[in-house]
Amino acid sequence: ENHEFVEWEGGENRKVDISKMRDGEVVVLDNGTLRVAEKTWKAAGVAVPVFSLRSEHSYGVGDFGDLARFADWMALAGMKILQILPVNDTTMQHNWQDSYPYNIISVFALHPQYLDLEQVGELKDKALMTSFSRRRAELNSLDYTDYEAVERVKDEYMRIKYEEVKDKLDKDDNFRTFIADNKTWLLPYTAFCLLREANRTARFADWGENAVYDYRKAEELWNCEDARYISFIQYHLHTQLKRAAEHAAEKGIAIMGDMPIGVSRDSAEAWANPAIF
């Protein structure tokens, strides 16, 4: 448009043999596509599991709060991409064998270990908070992640917090919206978790009459207090991961998450939707 030189075409010079052409002949030649370098976007980044981002704010394992804090460091370093391993729930046996992040029990549910308890809020009982602060220091002092201890501490904390706020949840618009928007997967997931605990195994083939998913039974379980607690956990996880992703975006950081190829054979999806597995 401005009659300015833009770019030379790449590759060898294009050649046409006209030595045998006669007067009046015209050669129509198609040499394929224009050979110019792609204008691809490139950026530096870091690949790191969330569980490795442990900080003084953690309870023995990296959490979604640490994920947001790590984005701050990346922005200072001029990096743009933060790749993490899957953060889906993998709970089957409640021990270290559940730690493999690709053996997920739900496509949608997030792992309770990634809860940032600071964001959940302090407990009303100051003596309990002092006790949890001591246990946090003990977990953070380890040079490894004590998987079982982390799970116990976070579950204890969240159950106490749930008891504090459960009577107010029906008036919490954000919680109600989360439940309404996600009940399609929360219903089978909460039922799966409850039956896993009742049968002491995630292998649903061993659940007797519950080995085959029954929507009506899942609806019955949905109304119990333990199912609501599980949804409460997922609500906080969803909120915290969303907040971390938005914070990273504000810093110019894109979070790229690994996704498992499939789900565990003993998963909520495989149980509730056997026809597609």
What are these language model-derived features?
Residues E1-D30, W73, W96-S99:
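Alpha-glucan (starch/glycogen) binding determinants
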Residues V27-K39:
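Basic K/R-rich, polyanion-interacting modules in nucleoproteins and related proteins
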Residues E38-P274:
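Acidic/aromatic-lined carbohydrate-recognition and catalytic surfaces
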Residues F277:
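Conserved active-site neighborhood of enzyme catalytic/cofactor-binding cores
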